């Protein structure tokens, strides 16, 4: 959600900022803007809509080597040019961009800013107006910045320009991701490393409640008490080509095709020198010492957690509960004596999951994060991390991170099973290799997927996904993919629940996508298909080879039944992709959605 960039050096700041914002588009946004320190003061450009629209209004003739930029995803105030960042104080001395949510902004307005006329509806404008108010009391800019931050409750990543000190950028972070990048005679600010790989791969990770004074030749980190902090930069393990589409029309299609390679990469990363699965002994011991596992996640990661529960309970014979993070915070269940928590998040920055992690850390419970970003907030604050090794995922709708989560969860379950002496009954690494082969086969059948999307989804207003056992969980993910990028009202249901209410929604021509990959429930789901067909539904049956029947729409290559979810989801991803194309939707950047949900 949202993105911040900043640059100070000798190059053209405008172009670097705009390119940086383009690299942050995947995070989701509805408006964008930049501010640069020009010869005659700070110049602000901002627009509602895409960055391409912002580019059109930026004056190429304005020379500037210092600036900040922002992509906004509306939380306070409607998407508009007025509410877009950067925001300025009344005198225009201070210009600010902000990610996060200031929870007490209305109270700050009443107590400190009663005489200020506000231009926007945002909580962000309170910060920049408060800065001006604090400086007016005689404080230095740095003192005023610290005072301002101490009065704010909530999350923030801030970039601030001072027209009277044009050779520096003030930065602050609390509960919202922010990095400072290090260059040769220049420095940068970014919400994540991808934004500034164009100029540097050296970054300093900021911690909560830290402020930074960024100059062309120096970076000074301090805490809110004014004490200086030393921290060395790290090298971003990314290449600029990792975040390019290459020959693909969309990132989503590229990332779907990358899934076989991701699975093979995961196998390699989690094997020991003998080719055996081997996880960190500390993780294994912590789980074995627990009496119940609690999986906490949101969205696609939650669906991965549901499948992960099946892996752990069937392989390792340990009880597992799966909870939506946003609900867990406010309705915590009765915990067992020795709980172990697993947090699943592609970005590692999901605010709802982090809120639960803070709670469980305070309670003294051990936690593991499964994430695609090892240096992320969840990774830092949990006791242990299992990386996904999926590479950057740019499309808002998750594909390769989801199957990577399933693969890592299966490996975790198998490792615990081995430690407990449970017999798995098959070679997991071998079977995952077969999964990768099956994925390649499926990714080569795009024409068939396109035809199914056109037949069932191109013009429909709604769609239902049904499945039994683990197929139900895969159906939930398929429904989410479809609604995310095609805007079709899609819902996933357990096949046996149809007759308890949902079947009332079936009309003539209603598309129903049924999954049949599990032998023990194959006849049950076939019966459910007959029920909806009798009410006029248009069924699309996706079955596993060996379980197929006459009339099935698509047959998946055979893999071990336990790992079927990794394969069954591929056609659902592709069908959703092509449905979105047929409906002329923005596949990579669907409306109202953000890749990294960093506010609760």
From Swiss-Prot:
Keywords: Aminotransferase, Cytoplasm, Glutamine amidotransferase, Repeat, Transferase. It comes from the Bacteria. The active site is at 2 (nucleophile), 595 (for fru-6p isomerization activity). GO terms for cellular component: cytosol. Residues 2-217 form the Glutamine amidotransferase type-2 domain. The keyword Aminoacyl-tRNA synthetase does not apply. Its EC number is 2.6.1.16. It is found in: Cytoplasm. One of its GO terms (biological process) is UDP-N-acetylglucosamine metabolic process. CDD domains: GFAT, SIS_GlmS_GlmD_1, SIS_GlmS_GlmD_2. One of its GO terms (molecular function) is carbohydrate derivative binding. Catalyzes the first step in hexosamine metabolism, converting fructose-6P into glucosamine-6P using glutamine as a nitrogen source. Homodimer. This is Glutamine--fructose-6-phosphate aminotransferase [isomerizing]. It comes from Bacillus anthracis.
